[in-house]
Amino acid sequence: GVVRENCALNPSNPYEISKTDFDEILQTTARNFKVEVCLVRPSNVYGPDMRNQSIQQMLNAIQKNVFAFIGPEGASANYVHVHDVVQALDLCLDHPKAANQTFIISAWATMEEMVSGLAGGAGLNPPSRRIPLTLATWLAMTMQFWSRWPLTLSRVQAMTLRSRYSTEKIEKELGWKLTVPIMDGMREFAQNCRHS
């Protein structure tokens, strides 16, 4: 489904829980002291000089020719380039309509487009190997006690999500526009890894 600013929050890891708790404290404090705040909720932030562990592991698997897509085509990749986050933060600081609002910042591509960008940036053809979701889930559950096994349940879930983060609100209210599509950003990420 589509995730919007007014959707119920469902934090599932320590980072998400702490961010949700802080957002609630900030909103309460702002109301009590009549201070304007603006909450920004970026999806997975990455950039050419940022070492995002999940993207790096995916790139490594592509380079070693062991990467496989999971389940049917069209899974969601919700990431946002650091330049687009900075642009959004600048708008939130300066725009009067940002006061006491929450904005999602994200870009969307299919998992196939994301992987194609990474492979292209690494100078490789994109992989096409695909394993069924049931097999991937079974492998992740069966091998979960072997710490070196790369396919975890959380990774299976991340590779098969169908949700999409809507940026309609910040686009309409503040004029934010995506400048780095995921495929281009992933190509840049992989190229930077090649040259570093």
Stretches with model-predicted labels:
Residues 167-172, 177-196:
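Amphipathic terminal alpha-helices
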Residues 91, 95-151, 183-190:
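Mid/C-terminal beta-alpha module of Rossmann-like enzyme folds, strongest
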Residues 2, 39, 76-79, 164-165, ...:
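Short aromatic/basic micro-patch
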Residues 82, 113-116, 139-177:
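Conserved C-terminal active-site "lid" loop/helix of NAD(P)H-dependent oxidoreductases
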